[in-house]
Amino acid sequence: KHHYFYYPFFMLLTVFFLFFSDTTVSAAVKTSDLETVPWSMVTESSIINEKGWLQSMCATDQYIVCLVNASKKGTDPDTLIAFYRNTTDIDGNPVEQYSYAFSVTETDYEHGNGMTYNPNTQEIAIAGLFTNDPSDAGAIFIVDANTLHFKRKVQVGNGSINFFGIDYVPEKDQYVLMANRIADYAFYF
């Protein structure tokens, strides 16, 4: 038995109800708390490198640290900028919270796409992502969180994957890396 006979009838009935009914349909988009929370600027700083751009940031116990990427295709050294996170400096002296503390320009952190802070080692780990220097493929750059000076480079895997996101999970004393592979994302622990 073929039920194709009823198909045109149900199609016409569906079209009739869609276009000639008085039903009101509405939709809403849920907004993020970040969109509805009141924001206020707490500080402003002059630009240190006019050709660079803010690429990533993280917070340590003492500072809010920003990475200013110096160049897209070259190996110019990037700048790490520290702003005071607290109302006192590391020695207990009063400072203006969120004011400029210091900056360091010494190393190319490649694209510097992600940063995280490890309070156990007092180090910042920077995921490079794109690499202009082939020896930086798959590298994570380690920086002293108190001085912002480069300490070492850690090669993860065989260098075939570049990492563009990094986080530190204190409860597990573990880093989480995010890699962009063809058509998907991968997380490495």
What are these regions (language model features)?
Residues 74-84, 133-142, 183-189:
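Structural motif
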Residues 69-72, 128-131, 179-183:
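Short loop/turn segments immediately following the C-termini of beta-strands
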Residues 90-121, 128:
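Blade-loop segments of beta-propeller domains
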Residues 17-29:
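Sec-dependent signal peptide cleavage junction
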Residues 50-58, 107-116, 158-169:
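Repeated scaffold domains used in trafficking and secretory/extracellular systems
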Residues 61-62, 120-122, 172-175:
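Short coil/turn segments that connect the beta-strands within blades of beta-propeller domains
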Residues 28-50, 98-99:
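A short helix->beta-strand "capping" segment at the edge of beta-propeller domains
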